[in-house]
Swiss-Prot record:
Complexes and interactors: The 26S proteasome consists of a 20S proteasome core and two 19S regulatory subunits. The 20S proteasome core is a barrel-shaped complex made of 28 subunits that are arranged in four stacked rings. The two outer rings are each formed by seven alpha subunits, and the two inner rings are formed by seven beta subunits. The proteolytic activity is exerted by three beta-subunits PSMB5, PSMB6 and PSMB7. PSMA7 interacts directly with the PSMG1-PSMG2 heterodimer which promotes 20S proteasome assembly. Interacts with HIF1A. Interacts with RAB7A. Interacts with PRKN. Interacts with ABL1 and ABL2.
InterPro entries per UniProt: Ntn_hydrolases_N, Proteasome_alpha, Proteasome_alpha-type, Proteasome_asu_N, Proteasome_sua/b
Species annotation: Rattus norvegicus (Rat)
SUPFAM superfamilies from the UniProt entry: N-terminal nucleophile aminohydrolases (Ntn hydrolases)
Name by which UniProt lists this protein: Proteasome subunit alpha type-7
Gene: Psma7
Domain of life of the source: Eukaryota
Residues in the signal sequence: none
Amino acid sequence: MSYDRAITVFSPDGHLFQVEYAQEAVKKGSTAVGVRGRDIVVLGVEKKSVAKLQDERTVRKICALDDNVCMAFAVVASVSGLTADARIVINRARVECQSHRLTVGDPVTVEYITRYIASLKQRYTQSNGRRPFGISALIVGFDFDGTPRLYQTDPSGTYHAWKANAIGRGAKSVREFLEKNYTDDAIETDDLTIKLVIKALLEVVQSGGKNIELAVMRRDQPLKILSPEEIEKYVAEIEKEKEENEKKKQKKAS
């Protein structure tokens, strides 16, 4: 029996190959980073080069699900279907957010919509005639009490809460950077939190800020996509800080 074709059948050694293939596809997608600060949550995504005549707004990988929740996803943009997978998940999540608001009268919590997305993905791992969604997502936002949240889901339908995390092809390098550099001091202010995300992305992104897409959400404020000029300003400050640190090291060495 070909166990990699049967989505609902475990192989003798306990694998669901279609789910594992979807997880491997995510590892080839654009790198995305999420960091939870004190009063801010920041999402950063590696931006692929856009064709000269293409509208950049149609290739964004960060989107709002509701007034208090947004999401970034890692997909293989060059493979047919996977970016469309993200669109399906986003549309269903938005409908659920609207339905919850109409029924209950309050916006969803970040964990609620994360659990909904994870459950949707999980159903597609055990249904005949379907295949797993080829996307992983970082979901951020604020709860009623103003607490910032960051969650990550994968194609299998599992989800976890994080202080900082990365998905996509550069996830391993970025996660190692975050493990070394994520401290209370590193997220003391909004600007420091934004810089931490940019520094993490610069570990794997070439050509500096022009290949970075960045979004911030502050307490009681809507999602804001940073302009290329704002991102370049932060990158310039980071480069200046690096130069100053190098000079200090050279002085100590001499």
